[in-house]
Amino acid sequence: MSEEFLFELEESTLKKMLKRKEEMGYAKKSWNEWFDSFLNDNKTESTKEKLERIFEKITLEKYYDEWIQNFSLNLDNIQNDHSARELIPQTNDDLPSSALVIGRGPSIKKHNHLEILSKSNYKGTILCSDGSLANVLKAGITPDKFKNFFVMTIDTQERQKKLYEDPIIKKYGNKIKCILSSTASPHTYNKIKEAGMEVYWIHTLVDYNKGKNSFNYISGVMTKTEKHPKGLPAIQTGGNVGTSAWIFGWTVLKHSHVGLIGIDHGYYSN
């Protein structure tokens, strides 16, 4: 039985894979046949399991040291700021009806979603990906109109700080709550605070399946303090901030309905 699944690739990586697939004589054959040609290792793993293992290995090798370094530098701020656990509704009366996650995929322009939303009477939560925030605010979708307004960053790279440098973000920053991964760059954190935002920390799950030897377990224990006796909430990310925001919407904020715009997870043929 075939299995369908999704994973995130940069466009440059996809192009390299297409070229390599053609060079190996698999241009007109399925992706499954190509993957099986070099993943066949006499184990009982499915193709899906093999790919997940390979991409996990690549991710850990590329980012593990950076996660540890960023976490250690963030620890003082984590202990002094908010845990995203504080955002969990305490009573049924606190439960909002819906949330809308906003990404920056090309479909958001194709379907004119920002203009439609800015003119709407939507009363639910706004959950912006960091990359979409400036354009969302410029489109008139601001915390002045949409009161329950969040932005999220999970990526570890220092370049994410540029997403918070637009002057319009500082204009509205003190009305926006930022959901930030404990492994985010401290430089990104500084830009977020300069914009006037309150930070609510989370853990992003990467290796929790490894038990007490995992980075997730160790960092989870280290963030349990008198102020945060239960530590930080931890979420699966799906490998990107849009999926992370969607998961955060129903696991932490407890929304029963979470909509998506600008979350494409792919490329148009043109």
Where are these regions (language model features)?
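Small-side-chain structural scaffolding
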Residues: 99, 103, 128-129, 153, ...
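Active-site-proximal structural scaffolding
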Residues: 129, 171-172, 181, 242, ...
